[in-house]
Amino acid sequence: HSGKLARIQSANSQPALRTAPGARHWKLMLLEFGPNQGGAGGDIILLGDGSLAQSNLDRVPSDLIVDRCYIHGDPARGQKRGIALNSASTSIIGSYISDIKSASQDAQAIAGWNGPGPFLIENNYLEASGENFMLGGATPGINGLIPSDVVFRRNHVTRPASWRTANWAVKNLFELKNARRVLVEGNLFETHWQDAQPGYAIVFTPRGEGGAAPWAVVEDVTFRYNVVRNVAAVFNFLARDNNGASGPLRRVKIADNLFYGVDRSAWGGNGTFLQIGEGPAEISVEHNTIMQTGNVITAYGGTRQAPSAADRFVFKDNIVLHNANGVIGTGLAIGNDTLSKYFPGAAFYRNVLAGGNASRYPADNSFPTVAWLRDQFQDVATYDYRLRPGSSLRQSGSDSRDVGVGYTALIEGIGANAAALLGLPEPSPPVPSDRFKDRTRGRPPAYIRPGSGGQ
């Protein structure tokens, strides 16, 4: 319907729309914003100011809404950024942001670093070459600022596979470098390959910008009810900035997600589910179905004699392919050796690690063949990873739920219409069983404080 929308386009390299300091209560609705005609190096929409010109909260625009807008770069030369999100109390909903791409610099559909939040990013199409969505990544003009209270829900985050043969600089799909209380739920993340970075689709790495923002943290993040597919690798976690002072990465929960097509042969990279560096604390991974070609977990940091330990790590009730190395840390052996040194005291139980060796891992996990596991799903050929009726994996989780992703929660989270478009089937009713007792007593809790907004 772009032909029916009023169109705003910059005649030069400056934003087509920018807010005045302290602006309040503006709604942009049913508008098209085209590429900046004077150059592809800037923002199309500038909400707030990312520089020292916005050095206190009184100057931050707030109560802004971008609703059902079409925002796009030039198909041939792209655009650096769709929306610069340096405001407060801002919603971006129902909008379509495309052709945000660059061969020479990072390009983002939405990025913010000097706005306090809260932010609602819901029901959008976000297409970019660098980082489709990012918080942090530049020094805030406001001392001590951390973008907070973020809800990122039911978005389609992707890029065209045809860009792979072009020269656009591809980095990741979703990145947090400075953020607090973030809820990421019901999204589709897809089509990501190794290019200007190693290939991880989702990146949580606190960055203090060379010591200029040592307060930067990534904490209290919940990632649930998402589908991540057709990517080179999934998560890259780093406890602290390795290039200067920063705060920590901590309290992250990854629950009830479906990951498939995590394939290094198709997309480059290493096909790893989770790379975890320097020992971030209170990470919980539970009830996920993960079909990947690389490691389950790769840990690094510290030395072989004194690895960087991840305190209160939880990995339970997941279905995953073990592949060659499963859970492995730098300089250590697969399984128990890595767990005892990189994840001391970890709650690692009731997982299905298909193709793994039980002698290398804690008890109360299972290690079927990959062929057997494939037979437990409804139809792997059509990516239907529901457990079939009668499978012994039904209601075998520590909480008496099915191990792996809960399809009812996944479909409710992603939305029925989106689920239908994805080809996700309706969930099967549970099969009554008391074969397993709840063994969660005595286990360390996940220590999660989910994003406060929208719940």
Language-model segments: residues:
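C-terminal low-complexity, acidic/polar tails when present
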Residues: L238-R240, R250-K253, F259-S265, N270-I276, ...
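Residue-level signal for pocket-adjacent positions within structured domains
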Residues: G3, G78, Q105, A128, ...
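Right-handed parallel beta-helix/beta-spiral solenoid domain characteristic of secreted/periplasmic
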Residues: H1-D43, R68, G73-P75, R374
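Pocket-edge structural micro-motifs
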Residues: S10-N12, L30, P35, P206, ...
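Right-handed parallel beta-helix
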Residues: R24-P35, D58-G73, S89-K101, P116-G136, ...
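Extracellular beta-strand/beta-solenoid scaffold signature
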Residues: Q9-R18, G39-L57, P75-A84, A103-G115, ...
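Acidic, glycine- and Ser/Thr-rich low-complexity intrinsically disordered tracts
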Residues: A6, S308-D317, L321-Q455
